[in-house]
Amino acid sequence: MKQTQRHDAIIELVKKQGYVSTEELVEQFAVSPQTIRRDLNDLADQNRILRHHGGAALPSSSVNTSWHDRKATQTAEKERIARKVASQIPNGATLFIDIGTTPEAVAHALLDHENLRVVTNNLNVANTLMQKDDFRIILAGGELRSRDGGIIGEATLDFISQFRLDFGILGISGIDTDGSLLEFDYHEVRTKRAIIENSRHVMLVVDHSKFGRNAMVNMGSISLVNAVYTDVMPPAGVMQVIKDNNVQLELC
């Protein structure tokens, strides 16, 4: 493959996934790490990607990739994370399930459970869980985002704040190198904070593509959650925050 073709293919992968690691690209294109690093540096110089240590992300921090693209990426990783999270939730538990494709995978993994009571602002989660007659599904009111089935706004925030539940299943768009949790929508950030504040145990579910991914709204530190479920060891800066704050780390 010519360099220009490889550059175009790298851009497509970054657009599709939001973030790609150097290791992924080496395996994908069967070239040396040095070659990939040169490619990424060239693309960063052209402002076509944002260079991170160990990978690359989209240069924009204001627009998320589409729900359909996110749904189709990292599916095996999301399923492993979802199964691990589901194994930690007992029958009869109460829980929030957040917006995002990984929380949606968790919802699917919970279908073998019994007598769960779920509050969600994710229409896709409600549609998945409604097939269970013994589940009680409480869907938050608010403004429906047609692009991904998320429900947000002041009404959503007020609704979620009424509850105090056992678990909060939280997704996130990106995690900066200092452990900051990043999102694209300010209204969604406020809802996530409400889920954190009203959950006894918060489980952050993230695949490796979220590490180093850029987004414009800072929700706060990863230290806000009780446990992180992911498929790879987080970058050194994130790991330091996890260790310093005794956050549980589960590699799936």
Region annotations inferred by a language model:
Residues 103:
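Conserved SAM/SAH-binding loop
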Residues 2-5, 9-12, 18-24, 30, ...:
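Conserved phosphate- and dinucleotide-binding cores of soluble alpha/beta proteins
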Residues 2-30, 34-99, 107-115, 119, ...:
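HTH-adjacent hinge/linker in prokaryotic transcriptional regulators
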